[in-house]
Amino acid sequence: MTDFHTLIDSYQNCACGQAHECAIRDIEIGSGLVSEAGEILKKNGFGPRLLLAADEQTLAAADGIEASLSGFTVLRHIWPSIRVATMQDVEKIEGYFDRVDGVLAVGTGSVHDPCRLACARHNVPLCLFATAPSMDGFASYSAPIVNGNFKITYPAKCPEVIIGDTKILADAPAELKSAGFGDMISKYIALIDWQVSNLLTGESYCERVAALTRRA
């Protein structure tokens, strides 16, 4: 298996002429990592004051994650249930930023996206802990947010750290796994969209990045 940082470094000085960069420091995938989340955060330089963001279902799925955060002063923002991320959710997360050094978002897209945009707007370190393989955007630089009854995709930030506990991911409901499969299949359409945009608007295009996506 190719080391993540080796893979990123191999895209330096690309023939397409674009600078390919990735702000992710660490990706940890393995069984039982829910009990190691705190140590992973410390290893990657997260400060002692932490916001834990989740909803009741995702926090239950990640049972044991709070116990792993020994040594952190933890504030909690727990939605009863969050299906669609709104700008109000972004602003709720931002309301903690005078009291925390980083954010641990536990869940998938609807939990991650408001944290992703809030952290981007305030340059706050972010760790995403995945509780289901329901989408393919864990490393995304954008966040779809409902604002004024319109869903808008905002430029955001990728997380500094991504953690996936394979036991938790395997135990996710079948419909969430199916949603993730659908997201992966849609990448083929997205690559065609990218080529069309390159032809019609001159958007930059890199065949090496496209090929990496196809292989994934």
Language-model features: locations:
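Short, electropositive, low-hydrophobicity segments enriched in small/polar residues
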Residues: 34, 111-113, 134, 141
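Generic recognition of cysteine residues
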Residues: 14-16, 22, 115, 119, ...
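Short, charged low-complexity intrinsically disordered segments located at boundaries
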Residues: 67-72, 210-216
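ATP/NTP phosphate-donor binding region
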Residues: 1-102, 160, 172, 178-182, ...
